[in-house]
């Protein structure tokens, strides 16, 4: 794998996808995301042998949004283990990421930890398990990624608080069903802070490289999580990482991954690499149009996927 010239492949892909440049639009329901240049494009691939391949705006920081939910799930599994799955499921949702209808029908148990309701439950677990939830989660993110400079972005977090009515509704509904154990405002403060983190593609590829290396971050040699739980997280990313478009991503790309409405996608090839792509224009499902196309072309050209 290390003999592949990914940088050359990136250039080929960008040239081939020039017709996709104007497709999609940036997220506008979170004011801070609406101000992003829609034409940015960055990508960074880091191999488990510490090779780096970058293209374009790979060192442009952007709001990773729902991608950060991978960290909260990882930390919840470290604390609660398999009991986590009594509070949240492992099935694709098939509905919008902030749907109330499915949640009510299923008695307040979210389908998976990556839709909003599921991530809110995971944050509730962390509020119960951690002495100082916001500080302890941030410390875990910094140490597991090997990037001590990671911070919450208070401007983005406040922007989400002001527009997060649906998330408050989800949390209160689950509270009514007994699946939120702590104060709703406290839980959502952690949730909004988590989703406010900004990283570059280069940082993001490093941060999630542990999922390509059996739970060990090659940059720090830290065992972030066990190989067994690494497998579980990758499986959920494969099935549930792209809102109601997870099947499409699995079909066309063939890698576990997670998207965010900030325009980022991180994808993992276990045993080989982690790649992050950033392009802010989104499709109707909230996934980056161009980032999905880039990753589809990458696995097609390299003939490397998990299938």
Curated annotation (Swiss-Prot):
The kind of enzyme this is, by top-level EC class, is hydrolase
What GO molecular-function term can you cite, just one?
glutaminase activity
What Gene Ontology biological process does one annotation of this record name? Answer: glutamine catabolic process
Q: What is its EC number?
A: 3.5.1.2
Keywords noted in UniProt: Hydrolase
What does it catalyze?
A: L-glutamine + H2O = L-glutamate + NH4(+)
Q: Does the keyword Hydrolase apply?
A: yes
Q: List the SUPFAM superfamilies.
A: beta-lactamase/transpeptidase-like
Q: Which residues bind substrate?
A: 66, 116, 160, 167, 191, 243, 261
Q: Which residues form a coiled coil?
A: none
User: What does the record note on quaternary structure?
Assistant: Homotetramer.
State the similarity comment: Belongs to the glutaminase family.
Name of the protein described by the UniProt record: Glutaminase
The source organism is Saccharophagus degradans (strain 2-40 / ATCC 43961 / DSM 17024)
């Amino acid at each position: 794998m290390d003999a592949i010239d990914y940088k050359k492949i990136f250039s080929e892909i960008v040239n081939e996808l020039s017709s996709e440049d104007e497709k999609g639009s940036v997220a506008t329901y979170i004011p801070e995301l609406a101000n992003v240049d829609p034409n940015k494009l960055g990508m960074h691939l880091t191999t488990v042998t510490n090779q780096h391949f970058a293209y374009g705006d790979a060192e442009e920081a952007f709001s990773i949004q729902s991608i950060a939910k991978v960290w909260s799930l990882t930390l919840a599994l470290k604390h609660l283990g398999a009991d986590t799955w009594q509070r949240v499921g492992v099935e694709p949702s098939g509905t919008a990421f902030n749907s109330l209808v499915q949640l009510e029908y299923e008695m307040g148990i979210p389908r998976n930890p990556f839709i909003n309701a599921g991530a809110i439950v995971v944050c509730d677990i962390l509020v119960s398990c951690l002495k100082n939830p916001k500080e302890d989660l941030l410390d875990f993110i910094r140490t597991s990624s090997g990037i001590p400079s990671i911070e919450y972005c208070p401007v983005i977090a406040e922007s989400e608080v002001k527009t997060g009515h649906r998330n408050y509704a989800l949390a209160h509904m689950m509270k009514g069903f007994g699946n939120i154990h702590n104060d709703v405002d406290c839980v959502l403060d952690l949730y909004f802070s988590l989703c406010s983190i900004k990283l570059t593609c280069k940082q993001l590829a490093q941060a999630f490289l542990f999922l390509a290396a059996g739970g060990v971050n090659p940059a720090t040699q830290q065992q972030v999580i066990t190989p067994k739980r690494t497998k579980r997280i990758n499986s959920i990313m494969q099935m549930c990482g792209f809102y109601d478009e997870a099947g499409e991503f699995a079909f066309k790309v063939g890698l576990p991954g997670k998207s965010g409405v900030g325009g980022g996608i991180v994808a993992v090839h276990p045993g080989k690499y982690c790649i992050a792509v950033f392009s802010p224009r989104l499709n109707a499902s909230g996934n980056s149009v161009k980032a999905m196309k880039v990753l589809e072309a990458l696995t097609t050209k390299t003939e490397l996927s998990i299938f």
